[in-house]
Amino acid sequence: MKNTFRSLAGRDFRYYFFGQAISLIGTWVQQVALSWIAYRVTGSAFMLGLVAFSGQIPMLVATPLGGMLADRFSKRNILLWTQVVEMAVATTLSVVAWQQSFSPWILITASAVLGVAGAMEMPTRQAFITEIIHDRSLLPNAIALNSLTFNAARLLGPAVAGFTLAIFNEPACFAINAVSYVAAIYTQLTIHLEKPAGNRTSGSLIEALEYVRRFAPARWLVAIVAVTSICVSPFMTFMPVYAQDIFNGGPDLLGILLGASGGGALAAALFLASRRSLAGIGNRIILACLVGGVASVAFAYNRLLTLALPLLFVSGGSFIMIVTSCNILLQSLVPEHLRGRVMALYTMSFIGMLPLGSLVYGSLAHQIGSVKPVFVIAGVISIAYGYVLMKVMPGLTQMAQRALRTA
């Protein structure tokens, strides 16, 4: 266990870790409340997908700008300002919920603003970790622990949201998120940066694109995350449908379903944090693609809550095993002067593909009148891609090992 949390020995990363963990719990509380309200207000799977699309599409459009800003300016200042914006949105949503004046357009607008802020924040946050981890050998562990905070919040946040929605009310969910940002902002202000806050490079996104295009391991890592995000999109978008229409539950059951997925993700992040080397990481990516795909197909045909929970656990664990492993490899390989922009491409493939999946799957579910085919399609894609990776991964692993030896 000591080996799992070894990066927390450093003061700066320890402060960042705990402040971010508190803030992310609030973020997940708000996310669950938004999805629940969207389905309650509209009663439409298509509108549920559209609200998700409006929050995720900025990741596809604006993330390159976030990556360029991260390479040119103080990463800490970018994070602070984006969190101030997100706190303001959470406060506004709490007031709107208290007045009971939600409409589809308010939900879409709020999601879009949060999406733009996230597009600035996420690549910056990925690159910021290298500034507060001063021993490069600890970088894989720090990245895994960063994923751990996200997934611990993903486990706790929906449970808190379900309890808050059932016992208190919707405004309380947004108020919890607004207050949670205080922890993140405070801890980031107390971090002592030992090197310049920004790389101040004037390079363009084209330089990062050229690096990814020419270097096969980086190209495949970005592609793997993109395909995985498309495959996991139904689990992100349609859980309110399953909670209400399939399992005849309410917001508390939605929290349980999302918590099961978060539990699997948390277990995967803990496993990766306990690894002392990158050995076997390629095989773990392949296995997660195959297992996650099977879980998606099985979930589509399942109508038993007792079976749905372990399937969601497996799906969540597979997803995080893939994207966090790819993150660790990419951050280990990428040159420092390209880090912000390359991680912007990673974020585009990670988060930016979700809106396409949400919109396409939402339209498909609306036309068919069922969400079952959506999960089947996603599962088949994941299994097929896992088979492709079985063919190409050995060569990619050799190229990555050579690059790491010469870094």
Please state what every model-predicted region is.
Residues 14-31, 55-70, 74-89, 106-165, ...:
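Substrate-agnostic recognition of the 12-TM MFS/MFS-like secondary transporter fold
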Residues 32-45, 238-252:
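Short amphipathic helix-loop junctions that connect adjacent transmembrane helices
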Residues 35-41, 93-99, 156-176, 245-246, ...:
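Transmembrane alpha-helix termini and helix-breaking/packing motifs in multi-pass membrane transporters
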Residues 61-64, 72, 78, 92, ...:
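C-terminal transmembrane bundle of multi-pass solute transporters/carriers
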Residues 127, 131, 170, 174-201, ...:
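Helix-loop junctions on the cytosolic side of multi-pass membrane transporters
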